[in-house]
């Protein structure tokens, strides 16, 4: 079996353009359905073919990059990488406002929070000071995150497997 989604190398310097485009072509030749590139400098998005998703490294305490002008994402399909659901809920309307479409997101903050008995509910993190079963808390938070993202996006989150 082959992967459905592939994230190419981070595009951090213009000098990487040929290498990134080769990697995209290789992924396409392998039949990978969804390809994304994380662009990490202003103006990088225009170098990426229109049929390739842009992975947005959501700024967090560890890393992240947003271009100085979000309109660079206009007309592009986006995948949010990292960050927290609260950051996503703030960022999605801004991205939609410039004409981008957020297709998907991934992060692990709900898993980290579950280790502390904290869950995501009604748009915020909650901890009632009671012991919480880890697996249930992760699943519950995941469902609540999808619900919140769909509400702010005004549509259902699309599957990576949809055509």
Predicted regions and their residues:
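Short, flexible loop/turn elements at secondary-structure junctions
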Residues: 41, 58-60, 82-84, 109
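Active-site beta->alpha loop and helix N-cap motifs at the rims of alpha/beta catalytic domains
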Residues: 1-59
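Alpha/beta catalytic cores of nucleotide-metabolism and tRNA/nucleoside-modifying enzymes
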Residues: 22, 28-29, 71-78, 86-163
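Conserved beta-strand positions
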Residues: 8, 56, 80, 105-107
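Donor nucleotide-activated moiety binding/catalytic core segment of transferases
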Residues: 51-79, 88-90
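Short catalytic/ligand-binding loop motif for oxyanion handling, primarily in non-cytosolic enzymes
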Residues: 15-16, 45-47, 63-65, 87-90, ...
């Amino acid at each position: 079996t082959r992967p459905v989604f592939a994230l190419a190398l981070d595009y951090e310097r213009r000098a990487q353009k040929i290498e990134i485009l080769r990697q995209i072509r290789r992924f396409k030749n392998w039949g990978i359905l969804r390809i994304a590139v994380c662009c990490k400098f202003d103006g990088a998005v225009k170098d990426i073919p229109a049929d390739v998703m842009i992975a947005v490294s959501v700024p967090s305490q560890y890393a992240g990059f947003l271009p100085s002008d979000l309109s660079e994402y206009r007309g592009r399909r986006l995948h949010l990488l990292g960050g927290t659901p609260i950051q996503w809920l703030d960022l999605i309307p801004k991205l939609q406002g410039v004409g981008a479409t957020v297709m998907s997101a991934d992060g692990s903050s709900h898993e980290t929070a579950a280790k502390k008995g904290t869950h995501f509910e009604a748009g915020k993190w909650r901890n009632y000071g009671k012991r919480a079963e880890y697996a249930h808390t992760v699943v519950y938070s995941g469902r609540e995150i999808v619900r919140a993202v769909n509400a702010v996006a005004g549509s259902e989150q699309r599957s990576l497997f949809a055509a």
